[in-house]
Curated annotation (Swiss-Prot):
Organism placement in taxonomy: Eukaryota, Metazoa, Chordata, Craniata, Vertebrata
Gene: PROP1
Source organism: Alouatta belzebul (Red-handed howler monkey)
UniProt-recorded name of the protein: Homeobox protein prophet of Pit-1
Region named Disordered: 29-73, 178-226
UniProt GO MF annotations: DNA-binding transcription factor activity, RNA polymerase II-specific; RNA polymerase II cis-regulatory region sequence-specific DNA binding
Entry coiled-coil feature ranges: none
Amino acid sequence: MEAERRSQPGKPKKGRVCSNLLLERHPAAGTLTTMVDSSAPPSRKLPSAGVGRPRFSPQGGQRSRPHSRRRHRTTFSAVQLEQLESAFGRNQYPDIWARESLARDTGLSEARIQVWFQNRRAKQRKQERSLLQPLAHLSPATFSGFLPESPAGPYSYTTPPPPVTCFPHPYSHAFPSQPSTGSTFALPHQSEDWYPTLHPAPAGHLPCPPPPPMLPLSLEPSKSWN
């Protein structure tokens, strides 16, 4: 067996490679072999898949992003805008027949007119919100300062006063009435300002007017005593 193995010096052993270079440089190291698995396929580094590189289509051209649809803006003339604004003032939501009739008058397509009405309604809502936004911060007391004060309006309601009870004058029965004579002098009417201070009336009640002034006694000359 050993003779057969020696007779085939040029046939390397499977899975093992002898390193003669190390033996020549280091003879004292003895027989030194390195184990190399030659049956395993050589490893290769896979390239990174598309990192930082543009992608190419199978046809060979570079793949481009799908560009967005370009919007075409329609320019309206002054006559067309006047007709559209007039129709918008009459009806903000025209039907298909009204839009087709307006399209014949203005020379525009029905789709353009429909888009114009949508934009016009959105513009009007935005204007209304901008007008109402400053008024939302004002308090109700601020609004009352701008309103004119009227003494009595057609819808103003006032509370009726309490019923007035009339009390007799406290001095109306204190003095008996005396007959009037021809030679009497009428006293001037006294001021009634003193009456509420001397005789305050209860709350919700007013006193009766004072009685007529009493006539003084007769000023005839006294008869002599005979």
